[in-house]
Amino acid sequence: MVTTGLEVRLHQGRERAELSQFTRTLDEVRLALRDIDQVYLLQGTRATWVVDDLKHERDDLVVRMQARDVQSTRPAADMQIPVLALVDGAAVLQRQPTVPEYFTKSTIERLVKLATPTVGVQGVSLAAYNGKTGELVELDDVVRENAKAAAYPSAISWGSVTGRLSELRTTEGRGAVRITIRDGRRAVAGRVPQDRTEQLREMWGHRVTLGGVLKRNASGQVVHIDVDRLEAMPDSDIGRSPAGQLLGAVEGVTDKQIDEYLRRSRRSHG
C-alpha cells in the first residue's frame, strides 16, 4: 500500500469526547510524528499535518491526517516516513517492551498518554492509509505497559554512545543542558553540565562521542546518558540518518519503494 496519511480512531464510551480532549489527543499524535521526523531527518522541510477527513463511525471518531502539499526539495513520500514509523512502533510495543526505531523517550511518553483511557476517549487506534485503511494498531493496555517499561531505566553503568548531536535544550535553574544524540534509527536523550553549553553549540549537527553514566531499559537499550565527557568525531554523513539515505535521499525513490522497505524492516524485527 502506498501511504498518503495517518488514520486516527478515537473510541468513545458512554460519554462523548470533550472538544478539549479530542484536540489534545490529536496534538499528541502530531507531536509524536514530529519527534520521529526529527530523529529521521536532522534538517529539512517538516510536514505540516492537516485534516484530510473527519467522520463518525458508530462509537468512533475517525480522523485522517495528511502532510500539506508544499514546494520543497524533500519528496512528499519522504514526509510519510513518520506515519509508517509511528504505526510500526506501536505494533512493536504490542509485542515487546523495547524502544522502536526512530522513537525517543518523549515519543514513548506520548504513546503512554494515548494508550491511557480518559473520559470520552476510551481508546485510540492508528493506521496508515491511502484510500483504504491499513492494519489498525490498537494502543491498548499492553502497549501502555510495554512503553512504560521501554522508557524505564533498570540498569546503570559507565560507558559511551556515538552519534549526531541533534537537539539542545537549556533547562532553567537545573544547571544542565538536555540533549538528544541519534545514530541511524536510534536516539538517546541525555544531560550535560551547563558550563559545556558553548562546546555543545559548536558540536550541534556533528558526530560526537559522549561518555558518562548510561541508563538502560530491561531490553538492554540505552535510554539516557548523564554526560561527563564530549569528543568530536569525523562526520560521515550530512543531515540524514543512514536509513534516511535509503528511504529518501536517492533520486527517483518512490512511495512504493519506501513502503516496501518499511515492510521488510517490520518483518526483520518481528
What are these regions (language model features)?
Residues V2-W158:
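Charged, alpha-helical interface segments at or near domain boundaries
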Residues R9, R164, R178-T180, G211-V213:
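Residue-level recognition of well-ordered beta-strand positions that form the cores
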Residues I156-T171:
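Structural detector for short beta-strands of small beta-barrel domains
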Residues G159-V161, R186-G190, V223:
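Short beta-strand segments
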Residues T170-R191:
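OB-fold (S1/OB) nucleic-acid-binding surfaces
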Residues Q194-G211:
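Short nucleic-acid-contacting surface segments enriched for D/E, G, S/T with interspersed K/R
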Residues K215-S241:
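OB-fold/S1-family single-stranded nucleic acid-binding modules
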Residues P234-G270:
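Extended, charge-rich, solvent-exposed interface segments
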